Amino acid sequence: MEELQGYLEIDRSRQQHFLYPLLFQEYIYALAHDHGLNGSIFYEPMENFGYDNKSSSLIVKXLITRMHQQNHVILSVNDSNESIFVGHNKNFYFQMVSEGFAVIMEIPFSLRLVSSLEEKEIAKSHNSRSIHSIFPFFEDKLSHLNHVSDILIPHPIHLEILVQTLHCWIQDAPSLHLLRFFLHEYRNSNSLITPKKSISLFSKENQRFFLLLYNSHVYECESVLVFLRKQSSHLRSTSSGTFLERTHFYGKIEHLVVVLRNDFQKTLWLFKDPFMHYVRYQGKSILASKGTHLLMKKWKSHLVHFWQCHFYLWSLPDRIHINQLYNHFLYFLGYLSSVRLNTSVVGIQMLENSFLIDTSINKFETLVPIIPLIGSVAKAKFCNVSGHPISKSVRADSSDSDIINRFGRIYRNLSHYHSGSSKKQTLYRIKYILRLSCARTLARKHKSTVRAFLKRLGXEFLEEFLTEEEQVLSLIFQRTSSPSYRSHKERIWYLDIIRINDLANHS
């Protein structure tokens, strides 16, 4: 306990108490513009919003002043979308403040991460950031396990929980008050958070801001797993996550251990399971074990109880599904993963005797589901719900090469992301859809038929369109067998993919 107290004292000294004044600094919004997430409002031309770059800090200052005034007309629920700043949409100001607020809130987290990496001497590896690195882990571990739990992490039932979560990390009272006021007013003024709907944690308009809130919330939910992993002698590991440590963590865990010892003395052994593995991406997590079904049910019960009692999160039991790996497809990150028993017969010749031996090996397989992927492509209007390619509307000044490059880039990104599939038939189907959709789009632009357009363009269109992936694979896997066969069977995991492809995200 003395060691923990010493850690807490050091951690308190690192807390940031003067973050609020940074909201009025111009360079904060320049950082939000330069390093924001794709799809952020700051990636759009500022002139589209009638916005002068040089006056950004003045606008933010005026907005925050209005927010703190008793009569905050700009945020009134009964107002229209136009604020008192003539010509500016009020949602734009919310996005400005949220982007800047997210940049500021990331400062203490970044400092803790750098400090933790230095203390634990963890090398900064970009490969560990890739979500594709999860699947080699699956290949190595899942084939030896028995049961898996699909877990949907519960959402906070009240906005105040999000504020209190950040309060454990940051003790800057003005910033927290602004965050609380900002969240409630944003919800009440045609925002992304409405009383009738759950919190939109992955808003396209405020990705950086809500990802910050969501990651801190999820880390709280996972804290019991982090603690138990550190306590078990069989589960020694070093984490490289962004939210590595947090204030008041051990205070809550100490109380949890007391509760467990008083109420569940006979079941503490389950936390020592040496074959438990945990993986998460966004709101979905996976808990896999070599233990029995009863063990997994106990884990499920304790997780639900922990979330409800210590974080006031109401998690329904049906949000955690327990299945056997051998007869269940695990849907994760756009892949259907499973463990299959492959049986092979080996002939052995020993002097005058020969005999056959049956060998069985557990093999990890990953497939791309065709129906959800076609649904995503249809939603993007490349085909109808039946998978029949259709033309897309394009700008009149778009050149043919730009259109072809756009369709080619979409397919290459999909093929790049789904390169780990055990079977490539789904990708070939998507390739056919996108290629014919491109041809229909070009034919529509030139007021011609697809056949006449392809005849005029020649066979170079088919050779040049979307063949880069197959060419790369054929160069990598030059074997005695045909390249097409090798590219059909080989799985490749790329370690430069840090987010799920939009078309691959069918959830």
From Swiss-Prot:
MF GO annotations: RNA binding
Recorded superkingdom: Eukaryota
Signal peptide: none
InterPro entries: Domain_X (IPR024937), Maturase_MatK (IPR002866), Maturase_MatK_N (IPR024942)
GO biological processes: mRNA processing; RNA splicing; tRNA processing
Organism: Magnolia alba
Pfam families tied to this protein: Intron_maturas2, MatK_N
HAMAP family for the chain: MatK
Function as written in the Swiss-Prot or TrEMBL entry: Usually encoded in the trnK tRNA gene intron. Probably assists in splicing its own and other chloroplast group II introns.
PANTHER family attached to this UniProt entry: MATURASE K
Compartments (UniProt record): Plastid, Chloroplast
Family under the similarity heading: Belongs to the intron maturase 2 family. MatK subfamily.
GO cellular component: chloroplast
Name of the protein in question: Maturase K
Alphabetic keyword roster: Chloroplast, mRNA processing, Plastid, RNA-binding, tRNA processing
